[in-house]
Amino acid sequence: MLLYEALELCGYDVFFLDYSDKDHKMNPHPFIDNKKIIPWAEYRDSYNKKVDIVFCPGISANKELKDCTKLKNPKSKIVAVHYGNNLLSDIHEMLFKEEKRFYLMSPECNVDHIVYSPHYKLAKQYYECIERAPSSEIPYIWDPKFIELDAETRGYSLGYKHSEKPNIAVAEPNLNISKTCFLPIITILKLLEENPDKINNAAIFANIFHDEKVDMSKVKYWLANQTVIKKHPQRVFFDPRRAFSYILKEDNPIIFSHQFYNSLNYIYLEAMYFGHPLVHNSPEFKTYGYYYEKFNIIDAKSCILNAVENFQKDELLHKKAAKQLIRKYSIEENIKSINEMIERINNA
């Protein structure tokens, strides 16, 4: 959606290509209502305008799409858009998952260009090898309207409320090693051992603890019976994943995050937009919140204590940093970069 709006703001004629059929419908959304949408059958059979670039975010460009587009314009470019850390996730999928789902090195994967989010530059050579095409960065952009709409729909009024003993929330997806709750859990255990009076509760929002297909019984037993949680059974909760607006509203927490080669994250911007303390290890967001290096548990614990003791005092500084970062990743601030990306694609 944001890529569509960014391209539109740059002056390009943009449309969504809709593959919906009787079995697969395009998800309705208020922000799509006023967008140009062309059904696949119409695009294939009767759409006669020249298409210069087809962006494929999160999906593969199948042969039919490529052939159809090239027939309309032999110079058109099919562009794979990678917003995920495919290098790490594919290693995990290929080696450790029973169901093997990863990019295959076959001619069907071929595209004309690849764009990747800036924090996935480490995978540049990987993308170029599997897609057999040149690659470049796509600007990272964010807009608050999505979480604002979600909060409005739920009837929430969001905004951090200072507390002497705040809650902590961890909201990592745990889909692969790049964003997990592992280090935050260990840090929270350390905090409860050494400074139990500094926080109220900690909530780990992680579906893996509720997935019937994954046997977490030994982990649950260890946490409940062989760690400091045994002394604080009503202070650490393992809940299913929830909408981030729900977490902000119901827990009013310090957001505690850990990432591994996944340093740009919408929840960081959402947390700072609503004024929440953020404990994180993302170099790109170093100016906001409380930053710890890599896997440093001791520093992460110190950051939590720093947030508890000093966030209210330093609130104006955090607001200034938040404003600068939110501006940095806005569509308006990235118009030039978007145009430069289009130029790179066309000239490749």
Indicate where each model-derived feature is located.
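Catalytic core of nucleotide-activated saccharide and alditol-phosphate transferases
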Residues: 69-165
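Structural motif
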Residues: 18-20, 55-61, 81-84, 117-119, ...
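Catalytic binding pocket for nucleotide-activated donors in carbohydrate/polymer assembly enzymes
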Residues: 250-329
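Conserved catalytic-core segment of nucleotide-activated headgroup transferases in glycan assembly
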Residues: 121-235
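Donor nucleotide-activated moiety binding/catalytic core segment of transferases
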Residues: 40-44, 211-274
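Extended catalytic core of nucleotide-activated donor transferases of GT-like folds
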Residues: 1-110, 237-244
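Well-ordered, non-membrane alpha-helical segments in soluble/globular domains
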Residues: 1-3, 61-67, 94-102, 180-190, ...
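C-terminal alpha-helical cap of glycosyltransferases
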Residues: 327-348
